């Protein structure tokens, strides 16, 4: 089975940094477990990294969310916890994809290139469910017409009720929630 795991923006600034929140910290073990299983199964893994620059506050997103975060070259930009090891070690079945917006078409291209076509399954975990996770799930769902799209609810996080609302929207779009 051709399978990909996408770990969305599980970075220091979203866990214990500029935009950190407890729910994001509480899913660390679930994410580590999913990554470990994907490595053991030789699945393709994409770690997306929200990536901004010194001019962040001048961008559309910066005006919407005026909190500098994930600035390239800062500790907050790095992958959180044990995932930071993937920034140091080259692994043939794992890539890091820097993205400057909530969702990235390059994610679809990266997955498609890895499989020379469409995978059977694309799984998602990470943060923030109602912003970057949902954006990338919808992009992949639109791009890959036959792949099963799966979101690990217990390995995603958002603030307050936004988690529930985002999961309900994804269910309504036919995404498999596990």
Can you describe what each PLM-predicted range is?
Residues 1-95, 117, 146-150, 159, ...:
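Active-site acidic carboxylates
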Residues 30-33, 110, 139:
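Alpha-helical elements of Rossmann-like donor-binding domains used by nucleotide-donor carbohydrate transfer enzymes
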Residues 48-51, 100, 127, 152-155:
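Active-site-proximal beta-strand/loop segments in catalytic clefts of secreted hydrolases
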Residues 96-135, 158-178:
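Conserved N-terminal glycine/acidic-rich loop preference
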Residues 121, 140-141, 148-149:
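Acidic, metal-binding active-site segment of PIN/NYN-like and related structure-specific nucleases
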Residues 133-143:
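Short Gly/Thr/Asp-enriched flexible loops that form oxyanion-binding sites at enzyme active sites
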Residues 141-144, 153-156:
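Short leucine-rich amphipathic alpha-helical surface patches
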């Amino acid at each position: 089975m051709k399978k990909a795991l996408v770990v969305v923006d599980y970075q220091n600034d979203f866990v214990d940094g500029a935009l950190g929140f407890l729910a994001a910290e509480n899913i660390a073990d679930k994410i580590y477990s999913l990554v470990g299983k994907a490595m053991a199964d030789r699945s393709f893994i994409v770690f997306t990294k929200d990536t901004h620059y010194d001019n962040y506050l001048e961008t559309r997103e910066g005006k919407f969310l005026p909190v500098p975060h994930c600035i390239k070259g800062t500790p907050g930009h790095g992958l959180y916890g044990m995932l930071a090891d993937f920034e140091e070690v080259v692994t043939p079945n794992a890539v890091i994809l820097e993205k400057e917006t909530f969702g990235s078409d390059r994610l679809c291209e990266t997955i498609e290139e890895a499989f020379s076509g469409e995978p059977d399954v694309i799984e998602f975990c990470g943060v923030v469910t109602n912003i970057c996770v949902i954006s990338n799930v919808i992009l992949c769902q639109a791009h890959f017409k036959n792949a099963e799209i799966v979101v690990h609810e217990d390995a995603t996080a958002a603030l307050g009720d936004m988690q529930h609302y985002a999961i309900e929207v994804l269910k309504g779009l036919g995404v498999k929630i596990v």
